[in-house]
Amino acid sequence: MFHHVSVMLNETIDYLNIKEDGVYVDCTLGGAGHALYLLNQLNDKGRLIAIDQDLTAIENAKEVLKEHLHKVTFVHNNFRELTNILNELEIDKVDGIYYDLGVSSPQLDVPERGFSYHNDAKLDMRMDQTQSLSAYEVVNQWSYEALVKIFYRYGEEKFSKQIARRIEAHREQQPIETTLELVDVIKEGIPAKARRKGGHPAKRVFQAIRIAVNDELSAFEDSVEQAIECVKVGGRISVITFHSLEDRLCKQIFQEFEKGPDVPRGLPVIPEAYTPKLKRVNRKPITATDDDLNENNRARSAKLRVAEILK
């Protein structure tokens, strides 16, 4: 069963100031915890567009949301297609959009999906099982330089070069096929002293490969910039991130649209063209409560940012 404990469930939805007849978009349906909480607040005129690139998540969500199916439109797609999705549904603007980024618990906990460095499985890490690129191709076919780049950029791994060299040496003998084979190779590239601190030694490289396989940061940047144009004035966007790269990107995008263009000096009245597109509802990100942490250890790194559309 696809069981997933949603992080900061109440805060993410409550900050959207739900209108009972509003139209909302869940860009990361996952275990549908946030969706269920939101749908309980909508009347029969309200609507939720539920997007996920994982078909398994969508099928399980249909069971979780079975009492609300008349209010939900399920979409199997990448959230970077947000504008196209809404256009196809003939929806101009929505009342709110939210994101719960990162891998859902079921994806991590089902060994066959190949996301976890604790369980042995074929290298995969595809959120969308229909796409061709998997972790196997990244590990066995990408160049040394490309591996160094993603390990450093997406994993912030300081031993990127050493790990990439070990991968290169191993795959010349035979392909690296499973998650635990890769873990062993990663450990070879990290000095023993460094392996003993900072969590699991493979954590950063696995994160980097997962982000590369699913093009996560680029997809999120594309999507949230579209979301800013798709939400009505007064509507809001909630984003939960789980690592510093996502959080930094979200903060930068919100800041950029909050700033607006430079205003020429001497204008008695500021034209609307120079007013900001949005305002950040919370200057500092909201973090998980003790209750969240007790229910889900993955909430420890979660941060919530919220923006309200002004024009």
Curated annotation (Swiss-Prot):
Chief place of localization: cytoplasm
GO molecular function, one term: rRNA (cytosine-N4-)-methyltransferase activity
Localization, UniProt: Cytoplasm
EC number(s) given by UniProt: 2.1.1.199
Pfam short name (any one): Methyltransf_5
Keyword Electron transport set for record: no
Disulfide bonds: none
GO cellular component term, pick one: cytoplasm
Family as reported in the entry's similarity comment: Belongs to the methyltransferase superfamily. RsmH family.
The protein's name in its UniProt record: Ribosomal RNA small subunit methyltransferase H
Classification of source organism: Bacteria, Bacillati, Bacillota, Bacilli, Bacillales
